[in-house]
């Protein structure tokens, strides 16, 4: 039996996959590790690259995109190890990442799952490294933007648990699917990833089932990985919002009572509509901001010059009629700005 089985699900991210496999190779030097790449019908030459550069990697090649959960399960069922690591292809491990995580899991038998500190490609901490359970309130606070406004609040910031230090090891509710080290015998007890979740939400569901079984989910910042985020998907797209919303509702229907699931769906709907409205207002404001400022500056310039001319050249107070300031100048400036933009 191996110490660790690493499972990477790939979908058209050849260059990121190459990066992560190099980092896995480096981090596995003194360990007994097997690595699986499950490909969801990529067309970018990913698997040819793996076979050429990483012959030690075990592969599963699907003829269609089976989704994140099912693809992971394919490899987990074939794995023979004490621990399983679900790892995104758009990540990079430190050389000590695997050794430190395995050591912690070995010393803490009550830990069912473990996640690490993640940073993005710019070195910024990713708040999804540690998350709370998406209760109706927590989901509403996140999707409405209240969590971003009050990140340190235990009430509003519960989704990403920002009141917990990013540098301290803590028990958390939810681990990120980008790096999720799991105890294999716990998976045998609670079941694998729920394949109802095609993408998004499966990590929340699995984390919740780990805690229901009496085990802990641990945020472990003693090692850091890079997660470039969303290379296989576009997080700002309408499709992402739709899929993420459906995943959250599916989680609620699965684990909450019918009444509570209904409240969850209501709060999510409300948050989505609120966020969409704010986004529309912001987009509209951002489009007219520069033309408006140009209009204002030019108009005030005309006004200042006219008043100066009246005072120091014409020596006649109110030489220009009020209509000049209220209608003529604004009209000319408006036409000029419109012509420019």
Regions found by a protein language model. Name each.
Residues 133-172:
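Short, flexible, basic/aromatic active-site loop/helix in glycosyltransferases
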Residues 92-128:
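Conserved donor NDP-sugar-binding/catalytic core segment of glycosyltransferases
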Residues 23, 39-48, 64:
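A conserved acidic beta->alpha catalytic loop
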Residues 61-79, 100:
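Glycine-rich, basic loop-to-helix element that forms the pyrophosphate-binding segment
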Residues 40, 259-264, 274-341:
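Signature of alpha-helical transmembrane segments in polytopic membrane proteins
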Residues 208-284:
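Active-site-adjacent helix/loop segment of glycosyltransferases
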Residues 84:
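Short aromatic/hydrophobic "clamp" motif used to bind/position activated sugar donors
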Residues 13-28:
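Short, well-formed alpha-helical segments that are part of the catalytic scaffolds
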């Amino acid at each position: 039996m191996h110490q660790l089985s690493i499972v990477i699900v790939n979908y058209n991210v050849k260059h990121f996959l190459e990066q992560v496999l190099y980092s896995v190779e480096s981090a596995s030097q003194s360990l007994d590790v097997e690595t699986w790449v499950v490909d969801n019908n990529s067309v970018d030459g990913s698997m040819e690259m793996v076979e050429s550069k990483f012959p030690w990697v075990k592969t599963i090649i699907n003829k269609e995109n089976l989704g994140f959960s099912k693809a992971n399960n394919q490899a987990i069922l074939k794995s023979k190890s004490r621990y399983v690591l679900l790892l995104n292809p758009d990540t990079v491990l430190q050389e000590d990442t695997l050794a430190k995580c395995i050591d912690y899991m070995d010393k803490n038998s009550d830990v069912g799952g473990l996640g690490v500190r993640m940073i993005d490609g710019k070195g910024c901490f990713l708040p999804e490294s540690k998350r709370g359970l998406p209760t109706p309130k927590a989901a509403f606070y996140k999707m409405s933007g209240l969590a971003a406004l009050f990140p340190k609040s235990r009430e509003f910031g519960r989704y990403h648990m920002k009141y917990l230090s990013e540098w301290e090891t803590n028990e958390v509710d939810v681990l990120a699917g980008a790096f999720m080290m799991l105890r294999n015998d716990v998976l045998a007890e609670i079941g694998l990833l729920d394949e109802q979740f095609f993408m998004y939400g499966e990590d929340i569901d699995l984390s919740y089932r780990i805690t229901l079984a009496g085990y802990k989910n641990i945020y472990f910042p003693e090692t850091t990985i890079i997660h470039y985020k969303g290379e296989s998907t576009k997080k700002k797209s309408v499709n992402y919002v739709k899929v993420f919303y459906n995943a959250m509702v599916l989680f609620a229907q699965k684990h909450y009572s019918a009444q509570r699931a209904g409240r969850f769906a209501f709060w999510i709907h409300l948050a989505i509509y609120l966020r969409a409205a704010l986004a529309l207002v912001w987009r509209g404001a951002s489009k007219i901001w520069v033309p408006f400022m140009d209009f204002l500056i030019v108009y005030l310039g005309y006004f200042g010059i006219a008043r100066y001319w009246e005072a120091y050249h014409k020596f006649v107070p109110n030489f220009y009629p009020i209509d000049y300031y209220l209608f003529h100048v604004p009209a000319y400036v408006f036409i000029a700005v419109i012509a420019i933009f």
